[in-house]
Amino acid sequence: PLSASPLARIEVDAQEGDVIASLNGKKVTNIADVTQLLRNQDNKQVLLGLVRGKIAINTIVTPHDIGTDAKLRYLDWVEHNGDKVAKASKGNIGYLHLYAMGSGDVESFAREFYTNYDKEGLIIDVRRNRGGNIDSWIIEKLLRRAWAFWQPTHGSKNANMQQTFRGHLVVLADQMTYSDGETFSAGIRALNIAPIIGKQTAGAGVWLSGRNSVTDKGMARVAEYPQYAIDGRWIVEGHGVEPDIEVDNLPYATFSGKDAQLEAAISYLKDELVKQPIKPLSGLPIPKTGSAADIKTK
């Protein structure tokens, strides 16, 4: 993500420590927010004035639109979280974030889950999840259990069922976990798959449909799919899913780069791995079987 930043382009020649002094000839010290000078400038060449030590430099930069900027910031956040988890666990714990629960997120989950399925621990992060409808597909993968394994003379061991995660799992959720992200969290709770860490989810449990079109090509979205527990209780709607371990990310600490929820998930899994280490797959010598049935012995 960082390499895709407009300032990272080699022809811009911006360096860490440079001070932005002006945009299109207008000094940034004369305005309250520098972004005011970037309005309607996406994908247009902008004259960027930099100060490097005592040297003034002018260069050309082409800003991204706000959507691209948001995507790059998101990818940077996910990458930073993954690096933090890997460093804290020495590579024993994996991390994946689900942005939403749509068709594009199937690809994201498959890529990240099957990269990490052989780790001793895994954090599935559904904070800020925007919903969709793939909760059952994901939960199905998490319910798979290894009951046997193959061990060739040369090569790696392979569990049956294949690509089964055998380690300790934790799910991160918060007050911005929405719709199918909440259904996923509720399923994790109901099926006792993993503990949930974070904050109570949004409470939007009645699904909407976009099939109600009107004559002017508009759409009337109607809440029409409530969900219930097997015993008939309303779940999610109006209340959300409460975490097993409540941890809040406070504003100033979050602004300063601290993620208490992620740190709690790492700490929880590290403790679990001490208390319940994951036993490696290891085959025993073949037992003695005796003589074949068609061999007669005296």
List PLM regions with ranges:
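Cleft-lining beta-strand/loop regions that shape enzyme active-site pockets
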Residues: 3-6, 16, 21, 26-218, ...
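Intrinsic-disorder/low-complexity coil detector
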Residues: 5, 62, 242, 284-286
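Extracellular repeat-rich scaffold modules on cell surfaces
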Residues: 9-12
